[in-house]
Amino acid sequence: MAKLDFITLGIESSCDETGVGLYHSELGLIGHKLFSSVEIHSEYGGVVPELASRDHIQRVLPLIKTVLTNAKFTLQDLSGIAYTAGPGLAGALLVGSALAKSLAWSLGVPSLAVHHMEGHLLAPLLEESQPKFPFVALLVSGGHTMLIDVKAIGQYKILGKSLDDAVGEAFDKTAKILGLGYPGGPALEMLAKQGDTNTFKFPLPMVNRPGLDFSFSGLKTFARNTFTKHPNKKSDIAKAFEVATTQILMIKCRRALEKTGRITLVVAGGVSANLSLRSELNQMGRKVGVNIFYPRQEFCTDNGAMIALAGHFRLSDGQCDTNYEINIKPRWNIEELSQIK
């Protein structure tokens, strides 16, 4: 394979999902595989970091082999290797970083540390219909809730963020209160479909304050108190919680668009798969003339495809790690990233 074809391998191991993606400079995404260790963690009611790390060790090499074989490429065809360096669980990040650095060193190709949330932010660029820069991005996941003004790849300004629980974390904790198990977000969404919108009305924290920051911990507390009083109204509580969170996110997105003057909104991260949220945002977009872009459902949650894409942009721009030492950044501000030339 001619080296004019730039091929990037992406490795995602920031939490409980092991993902591998392969991105080609001419063909785009040519392969990806994902393994989730949700079943391992479900009996504990949440992610156990040590178990997640051990599972990454078992899964990542077979996934790489499968992706390369299915795409009819070999390790020797790779031009660079990108890996999630943060934010995330330290042990889990170390697995991906160590493997990526070792492979890159042995193959004589560059490696690149990728910011997990930049991967999510750029995931809609894997679709046929792609957003154009500049835009506002709403990143909603189990660990983060952020509004970002995106002028170009690597040129990011945080407009607002959660001051306590991320919205995905609030979904999971509320689901646990309702006895729905882990992961709770999808289960709560399913239960909410059976709920009555008019039974309960949850508060909308911080929507009447200036600024674009979020707070979701109060909703979780409100859900617990409501459930204590009305234990037979699980579906109605789930519905009220979902309505409140989608309203908060919609209101803040609209304010961010008005503040920046942007006409494009990108919504990504695990919670972006929520259909009620998409419906609410799409309705807002039609009303104010804003174009909204999402990743396909399989790329809303953590995956290797988005890491391969984000890594490809930077590696093909000449950016790479300066050495093969294993470095991770469990806490990493997205504003620290450099702009692509």
UniProtKB/Swiss-Prot annotation:
Family stated for the protein in its record: Belongs to the KAE1 / TsaD family.
Known catalytic reactions: L-threonylcarbamoyladenylate + adenosine(37) in tRNA = N(6)-L-threonylcarbamoyladenosine(37) in tRNA + AMP + H(+)
One GO cellular component, as annotated: cytoplasm
Protein name per Swiss-Prot or TrEMBL: tRNA N6-adenosine threonylcarbamoyltransferase
PANTHER family documented for this protein: TRNA N6-ADENOSINE THREONYLCARBAMOYLTRANSFERASE, TRNA N6-ADENOSINE THREONYLCARBAMOYLTRANSFERASE, MITOCHONDRIAL
GO annotation terms (biological process): tRNA threonylcarbamoyladenosine modification
Cofactor(s) listed: Fe(2+)
Pfam families: TsaD
Enzyme Commission number: 2.3.1.234
GO terms, molecular function: iron ion binding; N(6)-L-threonylcarbamoyladenine synthase activity
Residues the entry annotates as binding Fe cation: 116, 120, 302
Residues reported to bind substrate: 139-143, 172, 185, 274
UniProt keyword annotations, A-Z: Acyltransferase, Cytoplasm, Iron, Metal-binding, Transferase, tRNA processing
Free-text function comment from the UniProt entry: Required for the formation of a threonylcarbamoyl group on adenosine at position 37 (t(6)A37) in tRNAs that read codons beginning with adenine. Is involved in the transfer of the threonylcarbamoyl moiety of threonylcarbamoyl-AMP (TC-AMP) to the N6 group of A37, together with TsaE and TsaB. TsaD likely plays a direct catalytic role in this reaction.
SUPFAM superfamilies the record matches: Actin-like ATPase domain
Enzyme class: transferase
Keyword Glycoprotein in annotation: no
Subcellular location: Cytoplasm
Cofactor: binding details: Binds 1 Fe(2+) ion per subunit.
